[in-house]
Protein backbone atom coordinates (compact mmCIF):
# COMPACT_ATOMS: atom_id res chain seq x y z
CA UNK A 1 0.00 0.00 0.00
CA UNK A 2 2.80 2.42 0.92
CA UNK A 3 4.75 1.59 -2.25
CA UNK A 4 1.65 2.11 -4.39
CA UNK A 5 1.04 5.49 -2.72
CA UNK A 6 4.63 6.59 -3.37
CA UNK A 7 4.41 5.50 -6.99
CA UNK A 8 1.13 7.34 -7.51
CA UNK A 9 2.57 10.51 -5.94
CA UNK A 10 5.66 10.29 -8.16
CA UNK A 11 3.45 9.83 -11.22
CA UNK A 12 1.30 12.82 -10.29
CA UNK A 13 4.42 14.94 -9.77
CA UNK A 14 5.80 13.97 -13.17
CA UNK A 15 2.51 14.68 -14.90
CA UNK A 16 2.13 18.06 -13.20
CA UNK A 17 5.71 19.26 -13.64
CA UNK A 18 6.57 17.84 -17.05
CA UNK A 19 9.96 19.12 -18.14
CA UNK A 20 12.54 20.90 -16.01
CA UNK A 21 11.89 24.08 -14.01
CA UNK A 22 14.08 26.74 -12.45
CA UNK A 23 14.10 29.30 -9.64
CA UNK A 24 16.63 32.07 -10.22
CA UNK A 25 17.50 35.40 -8.65
CA UNK A 26 19.45 38.30 -10.15
CA UNK A 27 20.91 41.10 -8.01
CA UNK A 28 22.64 44.17 -9.45
CA UNK A 29 24.23 47.13 -7.72
CA UNK A 30 25.60 50.15 -9.60
CA UNK A 31 27.63 52.78 -7.78
CA UNK A 32 26.76 56.44 -8.36
CA UNK A 33 29.68 58.62 -7.27
CA UNK A 34 28.45 61.91 -5.87
CA UNK A 35 24.80 60.85 -6.08
CA UNK A 36 24.29 58.87 -2.91
CA UNK A 37 23.91 55.15 -2.33
CA UNK A 38 24.40 52.67 -5.19
CA UNK A 39 21.32 51.71 -7.18
CA UNK A 40 20.28 48.18 -6.23
CA UNK A 41 17.73 46.02 -8.05
CA UNK A 42 16.81 42.42 -7.33
CA UNK A 43 14.49 40.26 -9.44
CA UNK A 44 13.34 36.66 -9.06
CA UNK A 45 12.21 34.31 -11.81
CA UNK A 46 10.39 31.00 -11.87
CA UNK A 47 11.20 29.56 -15.28
CA UNK A 48 10.72 32.51 -17.64
CA UNK A 49 8.33 34.47 -15.42
CA UNK A 50 9.45 37.32 -13.17
CA UNK A 51 7.56 37.00 -9.90
CA UNK A 52 9.26 39.37 -7.41
CA UNK A 53 11.25 42.60 -7.63
CA UNK A 54 13.04 45.01 -5.29
CA UNK A 55 14.32 48.47 -6.26
CA UNK A 56 15.97 50.69 -3.67
CA UNK A 57 15.10 53.76 -5.77
CA UNK A 58 11.39 53.17 -5.27
CA UNK A 59 9.45 55.65 -3.14
CA UNK A 60 9.00 52.92 -0.52
CA UNK A 61 11.64 50.25 -1.23
CA UNK A 62 10.08 46.84 -0.69
CA UNK A 63 10.06 43.45 -2.33
CA UNK A 64 6.87 43.45 -4.41
CA UNK A 65 4.97 40.84 -6.44
CA UNK A 66 5.40 40.84 -10.22
CA UNK A 67 3.05 37.94 -10.89
CA UNK A 68 -0.61 37.77 -9.98
CA UNK A 69 -0.24 34.41 -8.27
CA UNK A 70 2.18 35.97 -5.76
CA UNK A 71 -0.32 38.58 -4.54
CA UNK A 72 -1.84 36.05 -2.14
CA UNK A 73 1.34 35.98 -0.03
CA UNK A 74 0.91 37.51 3.42
CA UNK A 75 2.78 40.44 5.01
CA UNK A 76 5.25 38.19 6.84
CA UNK A 77 6.60 36.88 3.54
CA UNK A 78 7.07 40.37 2.07
CA UNK A 79 8.61 41.73 5.28
CA UNK A 80 11.13 38.89 5.32
CA UNK A 81 12.00 39.22 1.64
CA UNK A 82 12.34 43.00 1.99
CA UNK A 83 14.76 42.63 4.90
CA UNK A 84 16.85 40.17 2.90
CA UNK A 85 16.95 42.49 -0.10
CA UNK A 86 17.98 45.46 2.04
CA UNK A 87 20.71 43.38 3.68
CA UNK A 88 22.01 42.37 0.26
CA UNK A 89 21.96 45.98 -0.93
CA UNK A 90 24.05 46.99 2.09
CA UNK A 91 26.50 44.12 1.53
CA UNK A 92 26.84 45.06 -2.13
CA UNK A 93 27.57 48.67 -1.17
CA UNK A 94 30.49 47.54 0.98
CA UNK A 95 31.71 45.03 -1.59
CA UNK A 96 31.74 47.62 -4.36
CA UNK A 97 34.13 49.67 -2.24
CA UNK A 98 36.27 46.60 -1.51
CA UNK A 99 36.47 45.57 -5.16
CA UNK A 100 37.41 49.09 -6.18
CA UNK A 101 40.37 48.73 -3.85
CA UNK A 102 41.30 45.29 -5.20
CA UNK A 103 41.48 46.71 -8.72
CA UNK A 104 43.11 49.99 -7.66
CA UNK A 105 40.27 52.07 -9.08
CA UNK A 106 39.41 55.64 -8.15
CA UNK A 107 36.17 56.78 -6.56
CA UNK A 108 35.25 58.82 -9.63
CA UNK A 109 33.94 56.04 -11.85
CA UNK A 110 30.73 54.04 -11.66
CA UNK A 111 31.05 50.29 -11.12
CA UNK A 112 28.67 47.34 -11.23
CA UNK A 113 28.43 44.24 -9.05
CA UNK A 114 26.12 41.40 -10.05
CA UNK A 115 25.07 38.16 -8.43
CA UNK A 116 23.10 35.28 -9.96
CA UNK A 117 22.04 32.07 -8.29
CA UNK A 118 19.35 29.45 -8.55
CA UNK A 119 18.39 25.82 -8.91
CA UNK A 120 16.75 23.53 -11.45
CA UNK A 121 14.28 20.70 -10.92
CA UNK A 122 14.29 17.76 -13.30
CA UNK A 123 11.15 16.24 -14.86
CA UNK A 124 10.90 13.95 -11.82
CA UNK A 125 10.59 16.95 -9.49
CA UNK A 126 13.99 16.37 -7.90
CA UNK A 127 17.08 18.56 -7.69
CA UNK A 128 18.86 18.68 -11.04
CA UNK A 129 21.52 21.38 -10.68
CA UNK A 130 22.44 24.52 -8.79
CA UNK A 131 24.47 27.56 -9.80
CA UNK A 132 25.87 30.76 -8.39
CA UNK A 133 27.98 33.42 -10.03
CA UNK A 134 29.34 36.90 -9.39
CA UNK A 135 30.45 39.50 -11.92
CA UNK A 136 32.18 42.85 -11.58
CA UNK A 137 31.88 45.53 -14.24
CA UNK A 138 30.27 43.08 -16.63
CA UNK A 139 32.97 40.40 -16.39
CA UNK A 140 32.93 37.07 -14.58
CA UNK A 141 34.45 37.31 -11.13
CA UNK A 142 33.64 34.26 -9.02
CA UNK A 143 31.70 31.11 -9.96
CA UNK A 144 30.49 28.23 -7.82
CA UNK A 145 31.63 25.01 -9.51
CA UNK A 146 29.21 22.28 -10.60
CA UNK A 147 30.11 20.17 -7.56
CA UNK A 148 28.78 23.05 -5.39
CA UNK A 149 31.80 22.54 -3.13
CA UNK A 150 34.37 24.94 -4.52
CA UNK A 151 34.74 28.21 -6.41
CA UNK A 152 36.52 29.28 -9.58
CA UNK A 153 38.19 32.70 -9.56
CA UNK A 154 39.03 34.50 -12.81
CA UNK A 155 41.91 36.68 -11.60
CA UNK A 156 44.12 37.57 -8.65
CA UNK A 157 41.51 39.82 -7.06
CA UNK A 158 38.86 37.12 -7.31
CA UNK A 159 41.28 34.64 -5.76
CA UNK A 160 41.27 36.76 -2.60
CA UNK A 161 37.49 36.40 -2.43
CA UNK A 162 37.78 32.70 -3.26
CA UNK A 163 40.15 32.07 -0.36
CA UNK A 164 37.93 33.97 2.04
CA UNK A 165 34.89 32.11 0.73
CA UNK A 166 36.50 28.73 1.22
CA UNK A 167 37.80 29.70 4.65
CA UNK A 168 34.28 30.71 5.66
CA UNK A 169 32.72 27.44 4.41
CA UNK A 170 30.48 29.46 2.14
CA UNK A 171 30.39 26.79 -0.57
CA UNK A 172 29.09 24.30 1.98
CA UNK A 173 26.39 26.75 3.04
CA UNK A 174 25.45 27.48 -0.55
CA UNK A 175 25.27 23.81 -1.48
CA UNK A 176 22.78 23.22 1.31
CA UNK A 177 20.73 26.18 0.15
CA UNK A 178 20.74 25.23 -3.53
CA UNK A 179 20.00 21.54 -3.02
CA UNK A 180 17.36 21.93 -0.32
CA UNK A 181 15.90 25.37 0.39
CA UNK A 182 15.89 26.55 -3.22
CA UNK A 183 14.24 23.34 -4.40
CA UNK A 184 11.64 23.50 -1.63
CA UNK A 185 10.61 27.03 -2.62
CA UNK A 186 10.61 26.26 -6.32
CA UNK A 187 8.10 23.47 -5.68
CA UNK A 188 5.95 25.87 -3.65
CA UNK A 189 6.00 28.51 -6.37
CA UNK A 190 5.18 25.98 -9.08
CA UNK A 191 2.16 24.94 -7.05
CA UNK A 192 1.06 28.52 -6.38
CA UNK A 193 1.43 29.63 -9.98
CA UNK A 194 0.72 26.36 -11.77
CA UNK A 195 -2.09 27.79 -13.91
CA UNK A 196 0.37 30.31 -15.34
CA UNK A 197 3.73 28.57 -15.04
CA UNK A 198 2.77 25.12 -16.28
CA UNK A 199 0.70 26.04 -19.32
CA UNK A 200 2.00 25.53 -22.86
CA UNK A 201 1.49 27.97 -25.73
CA UNK A 202 2.72 26.53 -29.04
CA UNK A 203 4.42 28.97 -31.42
CA UNK A 204 2.58 30.61 -34.30
CA UNK A 205 4.97 30.20 -37.22
CA UNK A 206 5.49 31.50 -40.75
CA UNK A 207 8.29 32.27 -43.20
CA UNK A 208 8.81 35.65 -44.85
CA UNK A 209 10.80 36.55 -47.95
CA UNK A 210 12.91 39.70 -48.25
CA UNK A 211 14.58 40.47 -51.57
CA UNK A 212 18.16 41.68 -51.22
CA UNK A 213 19.12 41.91 -54.90
CA UNK A 214 18.41 40.19 -58.20
CA UNK A 215 20.58 37.33 -57.01
CA UNK A 216 19.83 36.92 -53.29
CA UNK A 217 16.98 36.99 -50.79
CA UNK A 218 16.56 36.55 -47.05
CA UNK A 219 14.22 33.89 -45.71
CA UNK A 220 13.14 34.60 -42.14
CA UNK A 221 11.43 31.96 -40.02
CA UNK A 222 9.20 33.46 -37.32
CA UNK A 223 7.95 31.90 -34.08
CA UNK A 224 5.52 34.07 -32.12
CA UNK A 225 3.36 33.81 -29.02
CA UNK A 226 4.99 30.75 -27.45
CA UNK A 227 5.56 29.72 -23.82
CA UNK A 228 7.82 28.57 -22.24
CA UNK A 229 10.74 30.42 -23.81
CA UNK A 230 12.81 27.37 -24.75
CA UNK A 231 12.57 26.84 -28.52
CA UNK A 232 14.74 25.63 -31.39
CA UNK A 233 14.66 27.14 -34.90
CA UNK A 234 16.84 25.45 -37.53
CA UNK A 235 17.25 26.13 -41.25
CA UNK A 236 18.13 23.28 -43.60
CA UNK A 237 19.13 23.23 -47.28
CA UNK A 238 18.26 19.96 -48.99
CA UNK A 239 18.02 18.38 -45.54
CA UNK A 240 21.39 19.63 -44.27
CA UNK A 241 21.61 22.03 -41.31
CA UNK A 242 22.66 25.58 -42.17
CA UNK A 243 23.59 26.64 -38.63
CA UNK A 244 26.79 28.42 -39.64
CA UNK A 245 24.88 30.50 -42.18
CA UNK A 246 21.89 31.27 -39.95
CA UNK A 247 21.28 34.60 -38.24
CA UNK A 248 19.47 33.80 -34.99
CA UNK A 249 18.15 36.43 -32.57
CA UNK A 250 17.82 35.88 -28.85
CA UNK A 251 14.39 34.83 -27.64
CA UNK A 252 12.45 37.99 -26.72
CA UNK A 253 9.51 38.55 -24.36
CA UNK A 254 6.41 39.75 -26.18
CA UNK A 255 5.06 41.67 -23.19
CA UNK A 256 2.02 39.44 -22.74
CA UNK A 257 3.74 36.51 -21.05
CA UNK A 258 4.73 34.82 -24.31
CA UNK A 259 7.92 34.96 -26.37
CA UNK A 260 9.14 35.63 -29.91
CA UNK A 261 12.10 34.52 -31.99
CA UNK A 262 13.28 34.40 -35.60
CA UNK A 263 16.02 32.76 -37.64
CA UNK A 264 17.14 33.96 -41.08
CA UNK A 265 19.27 32.71 -43.97
CA UNK A 266 20.42 34.39 -47.17
CA UNK A 267 19.60 32.20 -50.19
CA UNK A 268 20.20 32.40 -53.95
CA UNK A 269 17.17 33.74 -55.78
CA UNK A 270 15.17 30.90 -57.29
CA UNK A 271 16.39 28.31 -54.77
CA UNK A 272 14.02 29.24 -51.92
CA UNK A 273 12.15 25.92 -52.03
CA UNK A 274 15.33 24.01 -51.22
CA UNK A 275 15.28 25.57 -47.75
CA UNK A 276 13.14 24.40 -44.83
CA UNK A 277 12.73 25.82 -41.33
CA UNK A 278 12.36 23.31 -38.49
CA UNK A 279 10.70 24.37 -35.24
CA UNK A 280 10.81 22.42 -31.97
CA UNK A 281 8.88 23.50 -28.89
CA UNK A 282 7.37 21.79 -25.86
CA UNK A 283 3.90 23.01 -26.87
CA UNK A 284 4.03 21.27 -30.26
CA UNK A 285 2.88 17.64 -30.55
CA UNK A 286 5.68 17.16 -33.09
CA UNK A 287 8.32 19.40 -34.73
CA UNK A 288 7.13 21.68 -37.53
CA UNK A 289 8.68 21.97 -40.99
CA UNK A 290 8.02 25.19 -42.93
CA UNK A 291 8.84 26.57 -46.36
CA UNK A 292 8.32 29.97 -47.87
CA UNK A 293 4.97 30.06 -49.64
CA UNK A 294 5.07 32.83 -52.28
CA UNK A 295 1.27 32.98 -52.64
CA UNK A 296 0.85 33.89 -48.95
CA UNK A 297 3.57 36.55 -48.88
CA UNK A 298 2.32 39.76 -47.28
CA UNK A 299 4.19 42.79 -46.03
CA UNK A 300 1.77 44.49 -43.63
CA UNK A 301 1.95 41.91 -40.81
CA UNK A 302 5.69 41.66 -41.23
CA UNK A 303 6.12 45.41 -40.80
CA UNK A 304 3.85 45.32 -37.77
CA UNK A 305 5.75 42.45 -36.22
CA UNK A 306 9.11 44.06 -36.92
CA UNK A 307 8.01 47.37 -35.42
CA UNK A 308 6.74 45.52 -32.39
CA UNK A 309 10.07 43.76 -31.97
CA UNK A 310 11.96 47.05 -32.30
CA UNK A 311 9.77 48.62 -29.64
CA UNK A 312 10.12 45.48 -27.56
CA UNK A 313 13.88 45.76 -27.82
CA UNK A 314 13.74 49.20 -26.22
CA UNK A 315 11.45 47.98 -23.46
CA UNK A 316 13.48 44.86 -22.82
CA UNK A 317 16.69 46.85 -22.71
CA UNK A 318 15.34 48.93 -19.86
CA UNK A 319 13.89 45.97 -18.01
CA UNK A 320 16.79 43.59 -18.44
CA UNK A 321 19.86 45.82 -18.36
CA UNK A 322 19.92 44.81 -14.75
CA UNK A 323 18.73 41.23 -15.10
CA UNK A 324 20.55 40.29 -18.27
CA UNK A 325 23.94 41.65 -17.36
CA UNK A 326 23.76 40.04 -14.02
CA UNK A 327 22.48 36.72 -13.01
CA UNK A 328 19.86 35.12 -10.84
CA UNK A 329 20.34 34.81 -7.19
CA UNK A 330 19.49 32.98 -4.08
CA UNK A 331 16.34 32.09 -2.31
CA UNK A 332 15.39 32.01 1.34
CA UNK A 333 17.12 31.02 4.50
CA UNK A 334 16.16 28.27 6.91
CA UNK A 335 13.11 30.10 8.24
CA UNK A 336 11.45 30.31 4.85
CA UNK A 337 11.15 32.83 2.12
CA UNK A 338 12.61 32.47 -1.31
CA UNK A 339 15.53 34.84 -1.00
CA UNK A 340 18.89 33.86 0.39
CA UNK A 341 21.32 36.16 2.12
CA UNK A 342 24.10 37.95 0.30
CA UNK A 343 27.56 36.71 -0.37
CA UNK A 344 30.38 38.75 1.07
CA UNK A 345 30.32 40.89 4.18
CA UNK A 346 33.30 43.10 4.95
CA UNK A 347 34.31 43.79 8.49
CA UNK A 348 34.78 47.31 9.82
CA UNK A 349 38.51 46.92 9.06
CA UNK A 350 37.70 46.43 5.39
CA UNK A 351 38.52 42.73 5.15
CA UNK A 352 36.23 40.71 2.90
CA UNK A 353 34.76 37.47 4.22
CA UNK A 354 31.83 35.25 3.45
CA UNK A 355 29.35 34.29 6.12
CA UNK A 356 30.87 31.53 8.22
CA UNK A 357 29.15 28.18 8.45
CA UNK A 358 27.25 27.57 11.65
CA UNK A 359 28.44 24.74 13.82
From Swiss-Prot:
Covalent S-S links between cysteines: 119-182, 221-277
Gene this chain is encoded by: Popy-E
Residue numbers spanned by region Disordered: 330-359
Connecting peptide: region residues: 293-302
One MF annotation (Gene Ontology) recorded for this entry: signaling receptor binding
Region: Alpha-2, residue numbers: 109-200
SMART domains cross-referenced by the UniProt entry: IGc1
InterPro entries attached to this UniProt entry: Ig-like_dom (IPR007110), Ig-like_dom_sf (IPR036179), Ig-like_fold (IPR013783), Ig/MHC_CS (IPR003006), Ig_C1-set (IPR003597), MHC_class-I_related (IPR050208), MHC_I-like_Ag-recog (IPR011161), MHC_I-like_Ag-recog_sf (IPR037055)
Extracellular compartment spans: 19-302
Residues of the Ig-like C1-type domain: 203-291
Protein known as: Popy class I histocompatibility antigen, alpha chain E
Amino acid sequence: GTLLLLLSEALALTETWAGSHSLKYFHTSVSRPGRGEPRFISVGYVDDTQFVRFDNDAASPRMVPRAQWMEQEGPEYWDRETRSARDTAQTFRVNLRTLRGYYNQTEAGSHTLQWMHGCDLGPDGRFLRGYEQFAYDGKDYLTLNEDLRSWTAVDTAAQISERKSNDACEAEHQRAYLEDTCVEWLRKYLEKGKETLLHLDPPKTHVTHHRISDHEATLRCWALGFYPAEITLTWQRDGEDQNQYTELVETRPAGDGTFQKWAAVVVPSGEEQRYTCHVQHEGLPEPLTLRWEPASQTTIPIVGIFAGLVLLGAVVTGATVVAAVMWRKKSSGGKGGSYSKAEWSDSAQGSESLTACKA
